[in-house]
Amino acid sequence: MQTDRALAAAPEEAEGQPFWKLFADRRLIYIFILGFASGFPWAVIGNAFSVWLSDAGLTRTSIGVLGSVTMIFALNFLWAPLLDRVKLPWLCRRFGQRRGWILLAQAGVFIGTLAMAATDPTVGVTAVALVAAFIVFGAATQDVGIDAYRIETIPASEPRGMAAAAAVTAAGWWSGAGLPGAGAFWIAGTAPGGWSTAFHFLALVMALIVIVTLLFLPEPESDREAHQAEDEARVREALSKRRTPGRLSTVVAWFTVTAIAPFAEFVRRNGLKLTVSILGFIVLFKIGEAFMGRMAAVFYRELGFTHQEIALVSGLMGWFTMTLFMLLAGIINVRMGIFRGLLISGVAMALANLVYSVMALVGPNMALFAFAVVADNFTTAFSTVAFVAFISFLTSQVYTASQYAVMASMGNLSRTSLAAGSGWMVDMLAGSWAMFFFITTIMVTPSLVLLWWIRKQLYEQLGEVFYKRKAT
C-alpha cells in the first residue's frame, strides 16, 4: 500500500527535530501562499456575500438557498481527475501541470469577482446566483490543484512535515478568507459605492494572488506521470488479450486510469467497509460548524453589530487568533496523534457553539462577541488541522488530485449543500438563534461515534501518526 510504504520510509531525523523548526522550511511559504489563495474566494462568497444579500433585504431562507451555490465545492471530484491527467495548452507546458491549472482557475475567480461588483441583488438575484456559481467553480477547481500541489510538495514520507503543511495551509486559508473579508466589510460600511467598491477591492486582491503564483511559486516534483503510464500500459495489455482495436484500447486505458483507477486504488487499499466509514465520518464531522458558519454573519447583523464591529472582531481579531491557533494546532496534533486531535476538537467544536446560544440570549455584547469568536476559532483551528492532515495521509501520491478531491468534496458536502437549509432552520425555529446554535452543538455526535468505531482499522492503516499510544 503506497501510503503505508511512505509512512514506513519516513525520515528518522524529523522525529528528533523540534516541531517549530519545521516552519523554517521554504516549501511552507509556498503552501501558505496557496492556502491564502484557497481561502480568498470565501471572502467573496462567504460572510460578505451573506451580509450583502441581507443588506439588500433578502430573507434568511433566500440567503441560505443562494449560498447553496457553494455546493459546487462538493462536486469538484467530478473533474479533479482532469487536473491529474490533462495538460492545458501552453499553460501546463509553460508553468507545469499544477501551476497551469491553478492559474487558469485563479483567472476565473478574478473575472467573477469583477462581475460581482457590477451586480445588484435588489434588481434580481438570477445574475447574482450565476456570478457566484462561476466564482465557486473557479475556486473549487483551484482547490483541487492547490491540495495536489501541497501533498506533492511535502509527501506522506515526511509525516511531521505534512502535519506542519496542514497547519500552514489552514492558517493561509483563514488569512485569505479573513483579511480581505474584513477589508471588504470595512469598505462596504465606509466607502462610497458600498458593496460594489468592496468587491472591486477584492478583485484587486485576487489579481495580486495571480501575480504571486505566476512569479514566485515553483512546480513540485513528482513521479506521478510515470506511475500513471505504467497503470495505463497494464490496462492496454489486458485489452490487447481481448483483441480490442489499438485506438480503442488507448482511449479505454486513458479513461480507466483517469476516472476509475484513483477510486479503485483507494478502495483496494482501505477495503470497502473502511472506505464507506471514512467517507461517512468526513461528511458528518463538520456539519454543525457548517450550519453555524453559514448564518454567523447574518446572526451578528440581526443582533445589532455594525459592519465595522464585525470587521474588527470576526475579521481582524478572528484572523489573528485563527492563524495563531492553526500553528499551535499543528504542534498539538503531532504530539497527540490525529485521532485524539479529531476526537477532542470535535467535542470542543460542539461546546463552542453553545457560547453563541448564550450570546443570542444576552444580546449585543462586545466582550461576549470577542470571547465567542476566540473560542470558535480555537476549536475550528484544532479540528481543521487534524482534518486536513487526516485526509492528506489517506491520499495516494499517484492520484493526488483525484483522491484528495473526493474526500474534501465529502467534507464540503456538509459545509455547502447540507448547510443550505441553515437559514430555513432559523425561520422554522421562529428566529430562535439560541435554539439553532444548540442544535448545531449536537450535530457532531454521530461523526465522533463513527471515528471511535473505526479507530483500530485506521491505526493499522496509518500507524503512530494517527493514534499515538502515548501522547508526547
Regions found by a protein language model. Name each.
Residues M1-D25, A117-L130, T153-F291, F305-H307, ...:
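Intracellular loop-helix junctions on the cytosolic face of multi-pass helical membrane proteins
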Residues N76-F95, A188, L324-G341, V426-D427:
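Helix-to-loop junctions at the C-terminal end of transmembrane segments
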